[in-house]
């Protein structure tokens, strides 16, 4: 039986994808049945991080070693990830939500519609306030754009006002939010967004 929603999490290396998945699992695991597939090129570091954080039971986390371009494994030939998702769905037949975390990639990364239903793209403030206006599919067309690590803005000389202005310009009416995984700011917004994507899921109270 398929899960109700497959969610792709993409973004550059170091943008905070795994930390956001951890926070989302902590926020939603008492309300939804969740599993995670992580992608790394040669290791399973992200899967180990989630396991060690106890965000989910270890058997609900599957690490995939892509052995090559991270973009290929989520777009052109997503079979390795599709198999991993299907294995989790076979083992846990009441899944509401499966996260598929891509390996770190550039602003051109996008998921195959055969693999996920919804794409969340994550960038971080530490990369500079110019990132939103650089565009790319993740910035302009993802179902939700997340601008993470807002606590670092002052330290790196980035303006959140500029990032907000450019994000509104690039995304028009598509949703986006700021987050800080250290404090949890913005995580509830993402969690609510995901719950609203699941037609028959147990809604947040």
Curated annotation (Swiss-Prot):
Keywords: Chaperone, Cytoplasm, GTP-binding, Nickel insertion, Nucleotide-binding
Residues involved in GTP binding: 11-18
GO MF term set: GTP binding; GTPase activity; nickel cation binding
GO CC annotation: cytoplasm
Keyword Metal-binding annotated: no
GO biological process entries: urea catabolic process
Annotated compartments: Cytoplasm
A Pfam family the protein falls into: cobW
CDD domains on file: UreG
Quaternary structure and interacting proteins, as annotated: Homodimer. UreD, UreF and UreG form a complex that acts as a GTP-hydrolysis-dependent molecular chaperone, activating the urease apoprotein by helping to assemble the nickel containing metallocenter of UreC. The UreE protein probably delivers the nickel.
Task of the protein: Facilitates the functional incorporation of the urease nickel metallocenter. This process requires GTP hydrolysis, probably effectuated by UreG.
Family affiliation: Belongs to the SIMIBI class G3E GTPase family. UreG subfamily.
Protein name per UniProt: Urease accessory protein UreG
């Amino acid at each position: 039986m398929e899960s109700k929603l497959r969610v792709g999490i993409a973004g550059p290396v170091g943008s905070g994808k795994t930390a956001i998945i951890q926070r989302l699992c902590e926020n939603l695991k008492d309300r939804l049945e969740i599993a995670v597939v992580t992608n790394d090129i040669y290791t399973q570091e992200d899967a180990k991080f989630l396991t060690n954080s106890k965000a989910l039971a270890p058997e609900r986390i599957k690490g995939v070693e892509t052995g090559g371009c991270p973009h290929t494994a989520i777009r052109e030939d997503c079979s390795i990830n599709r198999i991993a998702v299907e294995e989790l769905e076979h083992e846990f037949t009441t899944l509401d939500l499966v996260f598929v975390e891509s390996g770190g990639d550039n602003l051109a990364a996008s998921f195959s519609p055969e693999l996920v239903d919804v794409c969340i793209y994550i960038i971080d403030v530490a990369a500079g306030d110019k990132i939103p206006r650089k565009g790319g599919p993740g910035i302009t067309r993802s179902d939700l754009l997340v601008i993470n690590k807002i606590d670092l803005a002052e330290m790196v000389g980035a303006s959140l006002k500029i990032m907000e202005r450019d994000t509104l310009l690039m995304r028009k009416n598509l949703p986006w939010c700021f987050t800080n995984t250290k404090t949890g700011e913005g995580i509830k917004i993402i969690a609510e967004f995901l719950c609203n994507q699941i037609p028959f899921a147990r809604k947040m109270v």
